[in-house]
Every structure is written in C-alpha cells, then in structure tokens.
Amino acid sequence: MNEDLTEAIALGHDLGHTPFGHAGERALNKIFSEGFAHQKQSVRIVEKLEKGGRGLNLTWEVRDGILNHQLSGNPSTLEGKVVRYADKIAYINHDVDDSIRAGIIREEDLPDTYTDILGHSTRERLNTLIHDIVNQSKDKPDIQMSEDVEFAFRGMR
C-alpha cells in the first residue's frame, strides 16, 4: 500500500465540490446540458486550473482515484479503493451524527437491521467498518467489506 498515493487521492478527491455540497451538485447538474459531477470537476481543477492553468503533475493513479472515489466508482488502485471507502464511511457517519445533533432523528431511530451489525454509536460503527475492511482485505488483491457489513453500510446511506 502506497501511503503517499493514498494521501494524494484523499487530498484531491473533493476539490470539485460545489457550495451546498451534493445539493449544489444536483442543481448544477440540471443547469448544464452535459451535467455536473464533482469528481470530474476535481480532476479538471488538478489538470487544468491549478498552477495558473498548467495543472499539477499528477500520476494517472492519482487522477483515477480522484475520478472514481464514489462508492459506485471503480478505482484502478488499492489506494483509490481505500479512499473510496474512507470517504463514504466519513460521509455516512457525519450525516447520522448531524441528524442526531439537529434533533431530526435519535440514535434509537436508526434501523436495528443495520445497527445490530455496525454498532449503536458512532465509535462502534467506525470500529466495525474499519476492522471489517482490514480483516476482509488482508492478504487479498482487493479492498472489500464482508457481505453483512456491506449490506448494513449501504443501508445506512
């Protein structure tokens, strides 16, 4: 695992986000005839806008990881797959935490179908997700989750 590559992908993967996050992205997607995707905008920023229009001298592995970091994407490298999972783990847990803090939901409102697998607190969920990925990926040519954890993870979205 190349930590520098993982870090470069992680640092660049969300550069193209719009104001108001995914809601802003959906609004721009309706306006532009060719659509709008923040991951494509992130690549555009690092390839064309940085350094006065010269772009950054990034490897294809970094650009591929930035472009394919969404859960539906398929990064070509293990490092890109690590960032893809890390991004979604953070995103889902932040959304749950924000919803609880805002009083929209309570921790006990989360479906038992998912929390019985992942855990009933943010700390438990993070621990389960990270350990599952490490255990399922150790000595294998891919980064992956077990079926039951992946089911619960996708359900929490």
Residue ranges and their predicted role:
Residues M1-A37, V43-V46:
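Acidic/His-rich, divalent-metal-binding segments that scaffold phosphate/diphosphate chemistry
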